[in-house]
């Protein structure tokens, strides 16, 4: 198997003691396009998906003989320069942006992951989170024992590395990765949108529930797959369709093929419409911007208030604020200036960084808000850190009243499918009434959109959405014995699905290795 390069030439470093295996809410991209500069297309593709993860980025390419993975910690623009992109030759590429939601944010856990097969190499990127990683890891150990290969051998502790090991470990001489994938994918439980590749073929797969988005696009000389349609737009690909839940796409010199490894039971994540996806993306044919604007209109109908201005928490709250202003007749204004060079506070690994980031990220326009009664519209309240600091800043800037309006219901339940609220203890709405949350924030009033109002704004049938973070009804079984952030998750009321006895991707023991690769080269041969 080939080496994996990082920007500083190092191959590995030790994880901090006590760190747990992370989950991912990430962006994935893939391209098959002979004659195109696939590394640059992928660079632009994952740049368009930067909002989905800002801790690490990586690209893998194949020229038909060998696979090279180049990845490092940091933003896409920090990881890759012209020299790095020029070194990534080939006609197939996959790319990935990542953030960790529990535990280590380290180079070993950056993606794409790389692993040996019987006849070459597989590279893989993953958006989502698996709920049966312990069972899958047992299968890996049955195959390899303590001789863990690929990213697991280098110290990775992600469910992604486990899937990569399963794909590689189940191949025998002459096997097609396509056929092996059809055996492995049904074993995976949880949420996953995958892009992976061997030396000759690009693959894309989506779990049977379609929790995380994944779309297919057509290039002039090939194909592209991405987490969001906006990434297809950026690289000049024409949207073809969504990858169906339970579908595996295979793209090679023979064209595009489709196989189904599971019966589709769609439950797309509603939080994609609320916050995660770009507003210029479409999910299930629905404009995210239009859905958010309609959420704002519904919010104004459900929670009217006398005020002078409607201002958004930029930029994720802007479409809903516009909708609120349109429906209420209250003038819309930009009362807050956002520093675009500060990452999303929701997608930062520790509360300390989040708190500092809020002050760096937003600054009030005093001349706009002084003496005004404000409606401040935001997309969600998770921990409450942003809104609490924001209310304080607005009052210090002279706001007469601050009325907070939220275009999603209270987040009361942890997400086990790849979003960064892993325990109920982290959620401000858990155990508190709306009035108690209002008092905690220091706002004059607080209004959340209803569950019905939010769902209706998406125009997607309720039964095709996952609303577990709002309702506690989980569409995918959470395996007993799993944990969230090292602690058992709370029990979940009977909702027709298996109760949660605690869930999270369990930590895979990381065995860090020493060594260095001064230049990003590969052999393409199995270990």
Predicted regions and their residues:
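Conserved short alpha-helical segments that host acidic/polar catalytic motifs at enzyme active sites
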Residues: 2-245, 250-307, 313, 401, ...
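Flexible loop/turn segments at secondary-structure boundaries
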Residues: 38, 101-102, 132, 203, ...
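Generic beta-strand/beta-sheet core signal
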Residues: 125, 197, 205-206, 217, ...
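Secondary-structure transition/capping motifs at alpha-helix termini
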Residues: 146-147, 173, 304-308, 326-333, ...
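A conserved beta-strand->alpha-helix junction
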Residues: 153-164, 332-343, 440-458
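PRPP-dependent phosphoribosyltransferase catalytic core
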Residues: 185, 200-201, 236-242, 392-527
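Phosphate/diphosphate-binding loops
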Residues: 231, 238, 246, 302-303, ...
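Short, glycine/charge-rich flexible loops or terminal/linker lids adjacent to PRPP-binding catalytic cores
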Residues: 329-374, 385, 412-422
């Amino acid at each position: 198997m080939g080496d994996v390069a990082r920007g500083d030439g190092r191959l590995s470093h030790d994880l901090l003691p006590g760190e747990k295996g992370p989950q991912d809410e990430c962006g994935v991209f893939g391209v098959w396009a002979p004659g195109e500069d696939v590394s640059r297309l992928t660079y632009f593709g994952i740049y368009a998906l930067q909002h989905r993860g800002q801790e690490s980025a990586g690209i893998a390419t194949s020229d038909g003989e060998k696979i090279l993975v180049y990845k490092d910690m940091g933003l896409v623009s920090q990881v890759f320069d012209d020299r790095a992109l020029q070194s990534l030759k080939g006609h197939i590429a996959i790319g990935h942006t990542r953030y960790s939601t529990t535990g280590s944010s380290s180079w070993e856990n950056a993606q794409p992951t790389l692993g040996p097969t019987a006849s070459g190499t597989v590279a893989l990127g993953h958006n989502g989170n698996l709920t049966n990683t312990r069972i899958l890891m047992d299968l890996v150990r049955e195959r390899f024992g303590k001789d863990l290969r690929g990213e697991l051998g280098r110290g990775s502790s992600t469910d992604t590395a486990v899937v990569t090991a399963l794909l590689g470990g189940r191949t025998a001489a002459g096997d097609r990765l396509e056929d092996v994938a059809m055996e492995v994918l049904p074993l995976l439980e949880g949420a996953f949108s995958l892009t992976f590749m061997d030396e000759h073929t690009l693959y894309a797969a989506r779990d049977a529930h379609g929790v995380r988005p994944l779309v297919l696009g057509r290039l002039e000389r090939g194909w592209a797959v991405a987490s969001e349609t906006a990434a297809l737009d950026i690289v000049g690909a024409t949207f073809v369709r969504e990858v169906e839940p339970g579908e595996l796409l295979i793209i090679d010199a023979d064209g595009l093929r489709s196989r189904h490894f599971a019966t589709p039971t769609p439950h797309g994540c509603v939080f994609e419409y609320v916050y995660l996806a770009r507003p210029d993306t479409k999910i299930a044919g629905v404009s995210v911007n239009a859905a958010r604007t309609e959420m704002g209109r519904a919010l104004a109908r459900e929670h009217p208030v006398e005020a002078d201005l409607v201002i958004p928490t930029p930029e994720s709250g802007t479409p809903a604020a516009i909708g609120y202003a349109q429906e209420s007749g209250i003038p819309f204004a930009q009362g807050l200036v956002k520093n675009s060079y500060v990452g999303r506070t929701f997608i930062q690994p520790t509360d300390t960084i989040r708190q500092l980031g809020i002050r760096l990220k937003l600054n009030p326009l005093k001349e706009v808000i002084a003496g005004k009664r404000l409606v401040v519209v935001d997309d969600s309240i998770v921990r409450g850190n942003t809104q609490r600091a924001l209310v304080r800043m607005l009052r210090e800037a002279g706001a007469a009243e601050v009325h907070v309006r939220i275009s999603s219901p209270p987040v009361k339940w942890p997400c086990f499918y790849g979003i960064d609220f892993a325990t109920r203890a982290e959620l401000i709405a858990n155990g508190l009434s709306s009035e108690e949350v209002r008092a905690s924030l220091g706002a004059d009033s607080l209004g959340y959109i209803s569950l019905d109002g939010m769902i209706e704004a998406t125009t997607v049938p309720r039964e095709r959405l996952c609303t577990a973070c709002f309702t506690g009804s989980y569409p995918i079984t959470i395996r007993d014995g799993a944990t969230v952030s090292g602690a058992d998750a709370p029990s979940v009321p009977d909702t027709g699905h298996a109760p949660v006895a605690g869930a999270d991707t369990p930590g895979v023991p990381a065995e860090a290795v020493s060594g260095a690769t001064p230049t990003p080269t590969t052999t393409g041969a199995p270990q």
